[in-house]
């Protein structure tokens, strides 16, 4: 294969939602050769994109990240308009529980203050009001929270299909089932070696999620992350009532786990009345993404069904279906994501952009634009300083 056919302006490694969004945002500028390399087939559910839905929310405790969700919203509307498919479904975002507990999702009281500061409307609710309105039972009397009506659910498969479609329409080359073995940056560009061939590119964007450290560690660095295989528990409803929102229960951790649970109502784009629940337990971390089994451990499932039995009388707590989702979370929860160039990690790293880890699906179109901006322009207008890749001088670990 000649050099002219193996050289690209931009190579994106990882063909999930952020990678495909990056390819779309870069290719739509025109005049650039863009390649996406995906180790599995496109639209697979082996990593962090499994399942049908993700939580859409405006609110964040951290105001710099909150500002980014407000920037992301019109980009979602553009994505919907370009593909003719509704992707954000505003069923509401209900947070309730211990208002002071700090979690990887945020803190209720701090988030309410952030909504006040940014003029985002919400309705404050007591435990009894939440029970009367939405049918929960047995909530501790001191639980409180809020309903933010603009939140809800994202159609995962619809979103991945949308950015896949747009990246192709704008001329990006998409190659599935091609595993990347090495990314070697230098001051003039980047060499990318796969199991099949070697490429040369001016810039590279890493959006390969749980497999990112396989490439970063070759630079003598490492991203401090935890990999968790989290259960997805589908339940049937004894009585289906419209109007229930997405919910997240903020609770004090136990000796066993973080004690955090969430639930989706029936998906508006589905014909099923089933609901999906899950825990957010950062326990039993995996050593490697390939250690994921695709089948949840019994104890976390039991914790979910026990919570449903205690507080959700409209559901049948016997699981109708079980699956898992692979979550890659920063070891330092304050950073939330890894997003920025790798200039501090390796010689020539300014030619590599990294976007991995965290609960980032809600940022799909914005993260794609930021990655394209950083790769093609060397800068972005958005405040992403919190997420920068700055290694420890002693260990090389990016915490």
Region locations from a protein language model:
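Beta1/beta-strand and adjacent pyrophosphate-binding region of the FAD-binding site
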Residues: 4-16
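Short hydrophobic core segments
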Residues: 11-13, 199-211, 368
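N-terminal Rossmann-fold NAD(P) dinucleotide-binding loop
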Residues: 19-20
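Active-site substrate-recognition segment that forms the wall
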Residues: 24-28, 84-90, 208-350
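Glycine-rich FAD pyrophosphate-binding loop
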Residues: 27-48
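Dinucleotide-binding Rossmann-like beta1-alpha1 core, especially the glycine-rich loop
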Residues: 53-133, 260-261
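Flavin (FAD/FMN) cofactor-binding and adjacent substrate-gating region
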Residues: 100-170, 175-176, 182-188
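C-terminal catalytic lobe of FAD-dependent flavoproteins
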Residues: 309-399
